[in-house]
Design a protein with these regions (language model features):
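Short, contiguous pre-domain boundary segments
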Residues: 18-26, 164-167
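Short, conserved catalytic-motif segment at the N-terminal edge
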Residues: 22-88, 124-130, 409
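Active-site SXXK
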Residues: 38-41, 55, 61, 84-115, ...
Length: 428
């Protein structure tokens, strides 16, 4: 059995040549116990909880697990391939955060610089006290506020006074980056910049900041400074028509009917059908969303994540300094706003177990969180259920991809259990 596992791990070498593959035992992992990921994945697919799942596990720079299960979609019974393309949505954010910090390293700005130094449209903003009462913000949004989601900006998801303005503005149907900024400049903040944490469009603003500083489109900047150096050939904002057959359908869980429906076929010929909806069009992109616009493969994202695990370098290409990356993956929220969560419940102990760095969520206490792992794990996920995490203690990197919006499942935590229970030689 062990021989079969080793052979299956060697097969991808002919197709996926950048990352190094190894048998699990040589990396302190049990092959037999690693099967738990396979059993978990098949269970989710067989129960119809997800159409498919692709998962990669890396330890000490070697791939010890790379498998895909399921079909392309619930309405597309073609078997999934390992190089199929996923919408990674907010897993775009860590990439853009690294990109902006490349410019920081070049001395283009300081973290406490006000954003309006480069985007003057955002100089004079207001705060929504109620829907009918706006007051001038006393503080200016800084670049660090954007990186830590303490800017006061929003997504418009909640019922706070400012959020109704976001929903009306329909900012993600903007014709360009400038149009997006114009709309945002007319929206009120939720709170004084720097005073609270609120997950928001901050990284979209960072993407536009990159464009303003460099004169390049965000797409061109990422291609030149991250994707090309790392050999990430399947990561982009706009799906090339020649790769359209690999772009997977997207699904959503309906909490009322408890059904899962296809909401985007992923097909080029159907792309016009989602214009004007809340879904993004990945074929006719008008604005490059730094907060959620990228499409990628599990393999490509593993290359990026392995580069981070290896202190900013991959295959001899360094995209960011080791010290800079360590700085980014420390907790940066002040004690007054320590802890992150969807809601605003600082008394929730699970919230205190997490904090936020410069573009990454960080686990302070897996014990309080109640999920196996190590202190210092940094990670992020996407709206369609994608997830990655890097464990500096155990030298483990996991990338897992599905395409399911509003997932009610505990797949991410289940995957952590399945991964960590396979460790034979722990470094902790």
């Amino acid at each position: 059995m062990k021989q079969l596992i080793i052979i299956s791990l060697l097969i991808p070498l002919f197709t996926f040549s950048q990352l190094k593959f190894s048998d699990p035992e040589s990396q302190g992992i049990s092959s037999d116990r690693l099967k738990m990921i396979t059993e978990l994945s098949k269970s989710y697919v067989d129960q119809g909880k997800v159409a498919n799942i692709t998962t990669m596990v890396n330890r000490k720079g070697k791939i010890i697990y790379f498998e895909s299960f399921g079909n392309r979609g619930l309405d597309d019974k073609q078997k999934i391939n390992k190089d199929d393309l996923y919408r990674i949505y907010s897993m775009t954010k860590p990439i853009v955060s690294v990109a902006i910090m490349q410019l920081y390293e070049k001395g283009k700005f300081h973290l406490n610089d006000p954003v309006h130094k480069f985007i003057p449209e955002l100089k004079s903003l207001k705060i929504a006290i109620t829907k009918d009462s706006l007051v001038d913000a006393k503080n200016k949004i800084t670049i660090k506020h954007l990186l830590t989601h303490t800017s006061g900006l929003s997504y418009g998801w909640s019922r706070q006074p400012a959020d109704s303005f976001y929903r009306q503005a329909d900012i993600f149907n903007s014709e360009s980056s400038d149009d997006f900024i114009k709309k945002v400049s007319e929206l009120p903040l939720r709170f004084e910049p720097g005073s609270k944490y609120n997950y928001s469009i901050s990284t979209d603003i960072l993407g536009i900041l990159i464009e303003r500083i460099t004169g390049l489109s965000l797409s061109d900047y990422l291609e030149k400074n991250i994707f090309k150096p790392l050999g990430m050939v399947d990561t982009f904002f706009q799906v090339p028509t020649k790769k359209a057959s690999r772009f997977l359908p997207n699904h959503a869980y309906d909490r009322l009917t408890k059904e899962i429906n296809t909401i985007d076929s992923g097909k080029y010929e159907d792309s016009k059908k989602i214009e004007g909806s809340t879904m993004r069009n990945f074929y006719d992109v008008k604005m490059y969303s730094g907060g959620g616009g990228l499409v990628s493969t599990a393999y490509d994202y593993m290359v990026f994540a392995e580069c981070l695990r290896n202190n900013g370098e991959f295959n001899g290409e360094r995209i960011i300094g080791s010290k800079t990356l360590k700085y980014m993956t420390k907790g940066h929220l002040p004690s007054t706003v320590q802890g992150i969560g969807r809601g605003e419940s600082p008394d929730d102990p699970a919230v205190s177990a997490r904090t936020f760095g410069l573009g990454f969520g960080i686990i302070n206490s897996p014990e309080i969180l109640g999920v196996i792992g190590s202190k210092g794990i940094y990670s992020w996920g996407g709206a369609a259920g994608t997830i990655f995490w890097i464990d500096p203690v155990e030298e483990i990197v996991v990338v897992s991809m599905i395409q399911l919006m509003r997932s009610p499942w505990t797949l991410r935590n289940d995957l952590k259990v399945a991964t960590y229970q396979s460790i034979v030689d722990s470094f902790e």
